[in-house]
Amino acid sequence: MTTYVALLRGINVGTKQRVPMRTLRDLLSGLGCGSVRTHLNSGNAVFTHPGSDPDALAAGLEEAIARELGLSVRCFVREGVNLRRVVDANPFADRAIDPARFLVVFLSGAARPDAFADLDPGAYAPDEFAVGEREVYLICPDGIRDSKLAKLMTGRRLGEDGTARNWNTVTRLAAMADETTEADG
């Protein structure tokens, strides 16, 4: 069994796109997933599955949500070891950063550093970013809401669909994935 992490984009914000976490756990169980746990109310789940294709799991979860809830929700699934790699590869690890203002944008495909080649980092200071394998790390010390750089990360510049999680959530999900892998042993 492989440990996976599912990240659902744009749910439970306001009154639209409501996906109760109990329902998410039930949908994942219905897809053959085991050891299903959710974190927060924002579409984060850790689970095991015998399959080896995270993209197929994401597609299956999207279909289940559409069928059962009538919602179109983009889902991103990563192997637990890949989420641990995201944490371990933190390009800002040597700095004290407010984890609530430090985001990881998880992409549907490979990150494209060339998509950012024309950006003048000084124009977005004090915000900073670094491009990973299938993610972009983003620091917004003055907050995310008014960050011009954060707005770019949700636009077409990325070339891929994405969903963001703050560092607190990323590290907690990585820890949950580690625990699940150890327990499933």
What are these regions (language model features)?
Residues 2-185:
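Surface-exposed, charge/polar-rich loops and edge strands
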